[in-house]
Amino acid sequence: MNRTSPYYCRRSVLSLLISALIYAPPGMAAFTTNVIGVVNDETVDGNQKVDERGTTNNTHIINHGQQNVHGGVSNGSLIESGGYQDIGSHNNFVGQANNTTINGGRQSIHDGGISTGTTIESGNQDVYKGGISNGTTIKGGASRVEGGSANGILIDGGSQIVKVQGHADGTTINKSGSQDVVQGSLATNTTINGGRQYVEQSTVETTTIKNGGEQRVYESRALDTTIEGGTQSLNSKSTAKNTHIYSGGTQIVDNTSTSDVIEVYSGGVLDVRGGTATNVTQHDGAILKTNTNGTTVSGTNSEGAFSIHNHVADNVLLENGGHLDINAYGSANKTIIKDKGTMSVLTNAKADATRIDNGGVMDVAGNATNTIINGGTQNINNYGIATGTNINSGTQNIKSGGKADTTIISSGSRQVVEKDGTAIGSNISAGGSLIVYTGGIAHGVNQETGSALVANTGAGTDIEGYNKLSHFTITGGEANYVVLENTGELTVVAKTSAKNTTIDTGGKLIVQKEAKTDSTRLNNGGVLEVQDGGEAKHVEQQSGGALIASTTSGTLIEGTNSYGDAFYIRNSEAKNVVLENAGSLTVVTGSRAVDTIINANGKMDVYGKDVGTVLNSAGTQTIYASATSDKANIKGGKQTVYGLATEANIESGEQIVDGGSTEKTHINGGTQTVQNYGKAINTDIVSGLQQIMANGTAEGSIINGGSQVVNEGGLAENSVLNDGGTLDVREKGSATGIQQSSQGALVATTRATRVTGTRADGVAFSIEQGAANNILLANGGVLTVESDTSSDKTQVNMGGREIVKTKATATGTTLTGGEQIVEGVANETTINDGGIQTVSANGEAIKTKINEGGTLTVNDNGKATDIVQNSGAALQTSTANGIEISGTHQYGTFSISGNLATNMLLENGGNLLVLAGTEARDSTVGKGGAMQNLGQDSATKVNSGGQYTLGRSKDEFQALARAEDLQVAGGTAIVYAGTLADASVSGATGSLSLMTPRDNVTPVKLEGAVRITDSATLTLGNGVDTTLADLTAASRGSVWLNSNNSCAGTSNCEYRVNSLLLNDGDVYLSAQTAAPATTNGIYNTLTTNELSGSGNFYLHTNVAGSRGDQLVVNNNATGNFKIFVQDTGVSPQSDDAMTLVKTGGGDASFTLGNTGGFVDLGTYEYVLKSDGNSNWNLTNDVKPNPDPIPNPKPDPKPDPKPDPNPKPDPTPDPTPTPVPEKRITPSTAAVLNMAATLPLVFDAELNSIRERLNIMKASPHNNNVWGATYNTRNNVTTDAGAGFEQTLTGMTVGIDSRNDIPEGITTLGAFMGYSHSHIGFDRGGHGSVGSYSLGGYASWEHESGFYLDGVVKLNRFKSNVAGKMSSGGAANGSYHSNGLGGHIETGMRFTDGNWNLTPYASLTGFTADNPEYHLSNGMKSKSVDTRSIYRELGATLSYNMRLGNGMEVEPWLKAAVRKEFVDDNRVKVNSDGNFVNYLSGRRGIYQAGIKASFSSTLSGHLGVGYSHSAGVESPWNAVAGVNWSF
């Protein structure tokens, strides 16, 4: 019970009162001394006995009070200071004390006693052997478990000691709490939650240490410990097993203790201080702290097994704060040091193959070999030696007395040699660095290209080695042949020197006062810094090399710059210095710099005098007060002037005159800024900008092409504003004495402080006190008339603009190509050609006069009154709320008021937008004018060049828009939504288009009388409601049905009109009549109740899909009409007729309007025929309908009497189905022609080879090269009705060899050739065949005259088809094919004197492959068979002659007959079966020629021929050849 509780206070006061008021003799108590039964709320200040028969509740035990609970029960007792409660058994009954509070008293629990839920605020609890304490909370007192048991104890600020084989289970020790487990006791399931547990000569099991808790173990055992955030220390021969160490937890093992089976997790610490730790599992991030001095550690880490034993450490991993000391005479092998890991190799210790990763540190005072540094740090301390170190990244620091031998310094790493440190044999790779401090030693250095050496020439520095150029040294205060690059740096200190230094990219050479350098090469990216009083001779500065210096007396620099010019800095003068790439020059007071060039990132500070400096892009120069700059050329750089700059030329870049002054500056593309009492005098502005800021002044500027801007507080005096220049005077700026040319642009505001000047016409102008007078605006000039100010007689020419703000007034402005924007009031403005006046919301224009080419625009809530609109003037406005317009034009008065526009004239850019709910009447839209109606209009006339739209403006559609009596007279009208009632369209340029409705809520309707005449057009989109329209198309007026994908599908798009009258008019059922026969699957049906007159209908068809446009007349049709259908190469799926026209009757006549009355539909031609039921169909039966047979006149004789015994009529014979008469199309004929051509090409080419073999007969044997050219004409007819004329020209070249054999001669040869055939189709069009051939031949000639010849030939054909359809449309295609053929011939040569007769017989065969190809009109073709086999029998008669000049000639004649056996070369066209190109039969051949030998090696021949058969006639066949023998 809490002592401060009200209940407790009441009881205490009551006890005192009773004691004071009631006299009690000594020994007499006010409580029950022997409790039998239940006693409540008593205060015990004497002895009370509670045996097994008694129970007390809420007993208060005060000083001198004692409660003995022996076998009984005590509940809720409070034991005050001096009070005592004893709990034990009696008569085998267990004594129980529940929920006792000890507040300064004592509770003792003996054998057979149990305490449950005790709270110790202060005081003590003793648990003896056999006693049990359950659930005690120790807040401030103490608990002593002496041989007894304590379970579930919470120590929260107090202490507990468990001794003499006591047992504590489930204890929780919070912060400030402690528990001592001693004298053979046992603690199990303990949680040390920030508190402390001391264990001596005892055992602890299943302990959890967290939140900074501590467990100290002496001569004891710790089993199954989990350390989550505290410390366990094993001391004095203690042992631990099965320890888990988590982040923040630590196990310390001293030199006499042992820990076995340890799991160390990330952030956990195992600290072995000379003791033993076995079966360690070191997880990633786990921390191991130990040394090699008597320590034994073994286990596994992320790299594998590791151990420390007998002063040797193998494979140890140090990270995250881990540390290993290698003690004297100890060693470590393959140690890995990661982030925050450290290792110390002490004196006389060794470490081999160490790896130092990023964040790891190794300190060496002993010996380290073969170390790899991967981002970590190795410190070589006094007496330390590192050999064979490889620095991949990271740092090796060689301290005083330390030494490193054979070090590899890789990219991104560095070796630092401090004073009295030594590096031997260091190899610096590209990107690596060797840093040698003053007094450091580095010998045998190998400096590779791209590596960095950082050093100085100070006392004691001793460096030597090789770089990419030569051997180098730094010793005795002198550096020779040093290469500096990639952060390399050499400082030449006072009284020392450097020679032959090379400074490459990233390198830097610093020459201090009284130091000297000679023969320095400064390359791109390198830096040479010569400090005041330093000396650098023979400097060779390359492009991009940076020089940092000043002109201070005593500084000496000489050399050549990057442009090859000699430069110097001496005797307080700098000449030809180039500054770039971080280079800088300071010109001190009393010195000067001449012809300096400042490139990108170069810098120059002038305190003295500067002449002729060039500032290129990104270069900077500052001219300080009292300093001067003359003739600077600024080309992209920046010059800041606090002093004086004269005759500067600014081509690009910037000059800032900040309190200084300039004279005669020339601005040609750059910027000059004058500010802070700076002054620019006589500046010439050709292009670029001069801007005058607050307290800046420009005087006498000439503005030729750039701009002068005068900002607030700035002043421009006597500026000359020439053509192309701009003078911009802003609010509170001033410009006086301006001389303005006619095209000089003045930009000003009426809030300028003061503007005065004279125009080119001599008129003075001004802006003062908010009033602008006679301002001229042109070529970009702008005057802003601000609120409560005014302008008068402003002249706004081309490119000028006047802005009249709210509450401002402009009077008498003239616009000649310029613009006036009116937000206030404009009076008596005149708008000439190109001028524009725009009246904005709440603006008002009064008495504006618009001349031809001028434009007045009135926006919403704008007002324009008393307007005069002359012919050719444009008015742009709408019927929006608030707009009020009134005026006159050539047709009378016009107005817009109350959302009604009347008698508007829109032309030459004029525009009227009629908004929804508003109206326009009697509008005229002329050339260049436009009108958009979202509301209603009537009697609108759209003349040539005018444009009218209904129901749409930009992206707004209005379904309720309506127009009545629209007259389109050469103009254009488009209906997007709404209703058009009664319209007329006339003129060749007149067009009316009704677009497909956007959706169901924005319909498009056409109703009433609509007349299209004089070549005008009416276009109807799909979905337009025309059911109430009566259309008339006359005098070549046309109606177009323009469907889109909204009605694509298997059904036609539907169009319906009430009536259709054609009077030489045209109706196009699809919009693309001139395109190939494709409609993207869209076909239209036009339905009308009545059709009359005469005219033309144009229809699309898709015969392959049995689809097409269609005309339907519900009632009678009268008149004469032509139907035009497009040709196509695609065949119908069937031969069924396609209905194009349906009528309900009448005498109308429909004929096919195509050429000849035929249309090409695939393979066959079609005609239009009536079916006798008022329908007209397309059919491939081209046979004309028979003339009708008149009914016979009735016989006047009376019918005979009926036969009393009639016999039935005999069954009539069935009427045969008529066979349609078909005719192929020209496209089909072209395909068949091409299929018949290839055998003829092969044959013509073969003839040149046969001719070659014939002229060799009986000639000497030689090796020969020969060539022949030939030309053939074939006139061909085929059974399929496809005729053509072929003209072939070709050339063949070959080589052969004739050789003697017994009783004869053999010939072997090869050839190749090319021929080209032009094929003219009888039905129109043409084709061509290009043929490449290759082959060989052989011949055997017996001495008797008998011979045998053979030829084999391969062909590659390229065929092109350029056919024509009946309408003249193209049917083009091409394909490749291959051919193979052979020829065998045998004969006998008979000779009689000079006469020779050679009868012969031959057999020839040819075949070609058959690709499928398509024509451009959709026709497809495939030759099923292309073959030729023929025999030939004939004879040749020749006569040999020798002429007087020795030349031999042999004329000859030949006659033969040929039989072609192949009669089934079939060609498949579309899907209409096979056509047979029948060229079989006999053919007569007649030839003549002559062979001549010009010399023993040169001969030639010439031949001509004629042949004829039933299908092929060759009017000529000519060949000429030449032969060279060798």
From Swiss-Prot:
For this record, an example GO cellular component is: cell outer membrane
Q: Where found, per UniProt?
A: Cell outer membrane
Biological process (GO) annotations held by this record are: cell adhesion
What is the membrane topology noted in the UniProt record heading this document? Peripheral membrane protein
Knockout phenotype, as recorded, reads: No change in cell adhesion or biofilm formation.
Signal peptide annotation: 1-29
- Compositional bias, Pro residues, is annotated for 1207-1219
Transmembrane region positions?
none
Q: Which InterPro entries match?
A: AIDA (IPR030930), Autotransporte_beta (IPR005546), Autotransporte_beta_dom_sf (IPR036709), Autotransporter_pectin_lyase_C (IPR012332), Bact_Autotransporter_VF (IPR050909), OM_autotransptr_brl_dom (IPR006315), Pectin_lyase_fold/virulence (IPR011050), Pertactin_central (IPR004899)
Q: Where is the composition biased (Basic and acidic residues)?
A: 1194-1206
Residue span, Autotransporter domain: 1258-1526
Q: Which Pfam families does the annotation name? A: AIDA (PF16168), Autotransporter (PF03797), Pertactin (PF03212)
Q: Please give the residue ranges the record annotates as the region Disordered.
A: 1173-1223
Chief subcellular location:
membrane
Listed A to Z, the keywords are: Cell adhesion, Cell outer membrane, Membrane, Signal, Transmembrane, Transmembrane beta strand
Entry annotated with the keyword Transmembrane: yes
What biological function has been recorded for the protein in this entry? Upon overexpression shows increased adherence to polyvinyl chloride (PVC) plates, increased mature biofilm formation.
Supply the PANTHER family for this chain: ANTIGEN 43-RELATED (PTHR12338:SF5), AUTOTRANSPORTER (PTHR12338)
What's the protein called, per UniProt?
Probable autotransporter YpjA
